[in-house]
C-alpha cells in the first residue's frame, strides 16, 4: 500500500476512537475525570502507578508553573481568555520531567538527546536548502508532508470549544476532535493567533501569542521542531530534517512554487495549485475565523476548501534581498521597548518584518517574514490560515536559520529577553501557547545545536575590510602625514628665513646713540 493509502487507513481508524479518549492535549488526559480534576499526569507504560515515569526517575506530577509578571500591549482584559496563564484554565498539574526526559508522560527525550536514559547526544539533524536536495531527498520530504496530511496524530487531539464549554452542555462529553499530523500543526498556529471570544459576534482581536513580539522567533522554532519530530516518527527516519527556502532572492517570483516542489499555479485558475502537484488536492482547515467568532466556537478541523495562492497582479512586489539579511544581522539588540510591532533597532522586529531591515520603522513597508507571506497571498496571507500552505514550513525554516545565525554571532545573555512588559505571551518565562506540556520562551532562546539541529548555510556578513587592507590604508595615511609634516616644516623654515634676512644684511654704524646726537 502507498504511504498515502496507509495515511488514509490510519485516519479512518482514528475516527473510530471513543471521544473520551481523544485533544491539542494528550488523548489520555481528555477524559471527564481528568478535566474536572485539572490534572494531566498519565502513567508511563502499563503500570498505573508509574505516573510520569516516577518509578524510573523520569519525572513526577507537579503544579504547573506560570508567568505572573505584568504584560504590556493592546490586550488589557483579565481572565477572559483561556490562554492567559497557559495552561491553567485546563490543567493545574502536569508531569514535570527531570534531566533530559521530556513529553506529557516523560516518555520521550529532550530535543537533541536519545537513549533509554536520554543521556546520549543525537547526531545533529542538518536542515538544508530545499533546492540542494537530491531528487530522492526531495521526494522523501514531499512524501512525508503528504503522509502527515492524511495520518491521524497518534497522541494529540484538538479542543473545539473554549475552556468554559469544554465539557459540553451537560458536562459529560469533552468537546474535542481528531485531526491529522499536519492539520494539528496548522491548528496550533491558528490557536495562537485567534481572537478572544467574548460572545456571539464580539471578538477581541488585540491579542497574538506568536507574532508582534519577542516570542515570534521561539514560538515558530518550537512549532517547527514539533513537526520535524512528528515526521521523523512517521517516516521512521531519525535524521529526517525540514529543508529551508532561501527566499532572499530580490526577485518577483516564488521559485519553490513549482510542480517539482510545492506546487505551481493552475493554468485555468491561478489562485489554485496546479493539478500536476500533489498539493492541488490539499484542503485547508481553520480558515473561517469570522464564522467561529460569530458562533463562539473554535476550529474543529473540518475541511473548508482548497489551498490557494494568488500572485496575480503582484509583479511589482519583490522578495527580500541578501542585503536585507546583512542589515538585519547587523542589529545587535535582540528586541527593544515596547517589544511590539513598533520596536526600533530590534533584530526580532526587523526579522518579523514590521520594521525595515536596518531596524528603522516605516508604516508603508513590509519586509522579511511579513513580506513573503503577503507575496504568496491566498491562504498564506492571513496568520490564522497561513500554516495550511506547505510553503510555510520552508519559509519559517529559513527565518529560523537567520535567527540562529544572529544567536551565534552575538551570543546574547538570557536577560536580552524582557522578563516583563512584553505583550501577553511574550515575556521570557511565559509558557508558549498552546504547546503541551508547557515550555517557556526562555527554553528555546538557544543556538540550534543545543536543540539537536543545525543549518547548512552561509549567510552574508557585514562588509568589513580584511586586516591587510586595513594595514595598507593605515600605512598610506601615515606616509601622507609624514610628507605633509615635512612640507610644513620646510615652508615654515622658508617663511622665517625670508622674514629675518634684511636684519642680517644691514650695515650697522659704529656710532653710539649719543654720538649721533
Swiss-Prot record:
Lumenal, melanosome face of the membrane: 24-469
Cytoplasmic topological domain: 491-517
Enzyme class: isomerase
MF annotations from Gene Ontology: dopachrome isomerase activity; metal ion binding; oxidoreductase activity
Recorded metabolic or biological pathway in which this protein acts: Pigment biosynthesis; melanin biosynthesis
Glycosylation sites: 170, 178, 237, 300, 342, 377
Subcellular location: Melanosome membrane; Melanosome
One Pfam family it belongs to: Tyrosinase
Residue intervals passing through the bilayer: 470-490
Ligand binding (Zn(2+) A): 189, 211, 220
Enzyme Commission code(s) on record: 5.3.3.12
Residues that coordinate or bind Zn(2+) B: 369, 373, 396
UniProt name for this protein: L-dopachrome tautomerase
Organism: Bos taurus
